[in-house]
Design a protein with these regions (language model features):
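Catalytic cores of alpha/beta
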Residues: 1-11, 127-137, 179, 183-199
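Active-site mouth loops of central-metabolism enzymes
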Residues: 1-4, 68-80, 119-127
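Generic structural signal for hydrophobic
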Residues: 11, 59, 88, 113, ...
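Glycine-enriched alpha-helix->loop->beta-strand junction motifs that scaffold or abut catalytic
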Residues: 15-17, 88-94, 114-120, 137-145, ...
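Active-site-adjacent beta->alpha loops and helix N-cap segments on the catalytic face
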Residues: 26-35, 44-57, 77-83, 98-115, ...
Length: 225
């Protein structure tokens, strides 16, 4: 948590518009091998939800960029949905990406997010387009378009399919669309940004956090975009 805190406090020097902060979970279904391993290692060090809230409390008012939680629904449910959302608001979180949020829970979670003025960021893949209108109904902030079929760090879907997905989402919603999963470097990010509003890089940033720290880490991250 100490390294994460330092990273958050250095965020202003980065070119990032927003940061996803993952809460460690024992069964991270959407995460590839590398992020899952980082999650297990962090959890093994005793970093749990309360520890992350405490760290964010210490950073409050010192981070000028939005931070959203990437969190699995079981964590939210175990903590108490409203309690988790209220606490997130208190520590300065801007919204949530919940990869395994059951559709039947979406309305309640979206309602509580709205109550605390936080975003519930919808995830839509090339295979879930037929349910896009339903998913978008409860979404806010931006749309997370999944650029790969499978887990984070996977191979990207074809450019043609991705473009069609993003164009379809833009017709259905006024929310900006960012593409993640399968975006690994500056070339990928530049390509994605020709038709989407943003690019999301996860796995490669986790790799960098294992090698660098402080300002050097920020410098290396900036090279990815």
């Amino acid at each position: 948590a100490k390294a994460t805190k330092e990273f958050l406090l250095n965020l202003d020097g980065s070119c990032l518009d927003l940061l996803e902060l993952g809460i460690p979970y024992s069964d991270p279904l959407a995460d590839g091998k590398l992020i899952a391993q980082a999650s297990f290692e962090t959890a093994a060090k005793g970093v749990n939800t309360d520890a992350i809230f405490a760290m964010l409390e210490e950073c409050k008012g010192k981070i000028n960029k939005p931070v959203v939680f990437l969190v699995y629904f079981n964590i939210v449910f175990a903590y108490g949905v409203e309690r988790f959302i209220a606490r997130s608001k208190e520590v300065g979180i801007a919204g949530f990406i919940i990869p395994d949020l059951p559709f039947e829970e979406s309305e309640e979670v979206a309602g509580l997010c709205a109550k605390f003025d936080l975003d519930l960021i919808p995830l839509i893949s090339v295979t879930s387009q037929n349910r896009a209108d339903k998913i978008l109904k409860f979404g806010s902030g931006f749309v997370y378009a999944l650029g790969a079929i499978g887990v984070s760090g996977s191979q990207r879907a074809s450019e043609e399919r991705l473009k069609a997905l993003v164009e379809g989402l833009k017709k259905r919603s006024d929310l900006p669309v960012a593409v993640g999963f399968g975006v690994k470097n500056k070339n990928d990010a530049d390509e994605v940004k020709t038709y989407a509003d943003g690019a999301i890089i996860g796995t490669e940033i986790v790799k960098l956090t294992a090698k660098f720290e402080g300002e050097e880490l920020i410098k290396q991250i900036n090279k990815l975009f």
